[in-house]
């Protein structure tokens, strides 16, 4: 399944707020929500499916990519669900987004693809690159790159940067301090339901 490129508002109306996908938060009428809940008996499969879809759309990854991350998480030590979230959060496109360098993860992915982002002073144009503690993220030393990202930071770095990251406005440098903990995840998600969804596939 390819990466979703359709209307983003339609997705968040169905799944709820997904800050990685879009910064829009459409309001739903409570009467329509109550009516839809009363008219449908939501199955456990659907609940697990929707949690999986939240994860996929928020991080902007394909079905195959998400399944691969689940398989990696299963082989790692610790809680599979928590490791899965850590793997997704440490992607370069997501780290760029969480530092406030882009308004959304798709926007951050575009910056990475267009070679605006450096990791440890080396250009990295792979959005799925897995960042590690002590990696530092900087902007390519070109006026176009600096202009784009400076504008993004001015408008989108309003929310608090998570504890596992820091950003120096003076040096225009982001730093990965550590692997993030569960409380720093920027998405309302029940990752255990995602693991259950893939229990027969991974």
Swiss-Prot record:
Q: Which UniProt keywords apply?
A: Chloroplast, Plastid, Ribonucleoprotein, Ribosomal protein, RNA-binding, rRNA-binding
* Localization, UniProt: Plastid, Chloroplast
Q: Name one GO molecular function term.
A: structural constituent of ribosome
Give every S4 RNA-binding domain span: 90-153
GO terms of biological process kind = ribosomal small subunit biogenesis; translation
Matching InterPro entries, A to Z? Ribosomal_uS4, Ribosomal_uS4_bac-type, Ribosomal_uS4_N, S4_RNA-bd, S4_RNA-bd_sf
GO annotations of cellular component type: chloroplast; small ribosomal subunit
Just give the chief location class: plastid
Annotated SUPFAM superfamilies: Alpha-L RNA-binding motif
Among SMART domains, the record links this protein to: Ribosomal_S4, S4
Family, according to the entry, reads as follows: Belongs to the universal ribosomal protein uS4 family.
Q: Cross-referenced NCBIfam families, in alphabetical order?
A: PRK05327.1 (NF003717), rpsD_bact (TIGR01017)
Function as written in the Swiss-Prot or TrEMBL entry = One of the primary rRNA binding proteins, it binds directly to 16S rRNA where it nucleates assembly of the body of the 30S subunit. With S5 and S12 plays an important role in translational accuracy.
Assembly, in brief, is: Part of the 30S ribosomal subunit. Contacts protein S5. The interaction surface between S4 and S5 is involved in control of translational fidelity.
Give the protein's recorded name: Small ribosomal subunit protein uS4c
């Amino acid at each position: 399944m390819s990466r979703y490129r359709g209307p983003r508002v339609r997705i968040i109306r169905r799944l709820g707020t997904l800050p990685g996908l879009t910064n829009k938060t459409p309001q739903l009428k409570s009467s329509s929500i109550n009516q839809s809940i009363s008219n449908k008996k939501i199955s456990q499969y659907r609940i697990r499916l929707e949690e999986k879809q939240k994860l996929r759309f928020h991080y902007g990854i394909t079905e195959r990519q998400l399944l691969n991350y689940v398989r990696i998480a299963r082989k790692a030590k610790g809680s599979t669900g928590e490791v899965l979230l850590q793997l997704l959060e440490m992607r370069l496109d997501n780290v760029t987004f969480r530092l406030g360098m882009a308004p959304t993860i798709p926007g951050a992915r575009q910056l990475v693809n267009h070679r605006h982002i450096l990791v440890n002073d080396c250009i990295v144009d792979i959005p799925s690159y897995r960042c590690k503690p002590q990696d530092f993220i900087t902007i390519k030393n070109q006026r176009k790159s600096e202009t784009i990202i400076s504008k993004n930071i001015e408008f989108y770095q309003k929310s608090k940067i998570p504890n596992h990251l820091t950003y120096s406005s003076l040096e225009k440098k982001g730093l990965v301090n550590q692997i993030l903990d569960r409380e720093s995840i920027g998405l309302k998600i029940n990752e255990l339901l995602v693991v259950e969804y893939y229990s027969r596939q991974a």
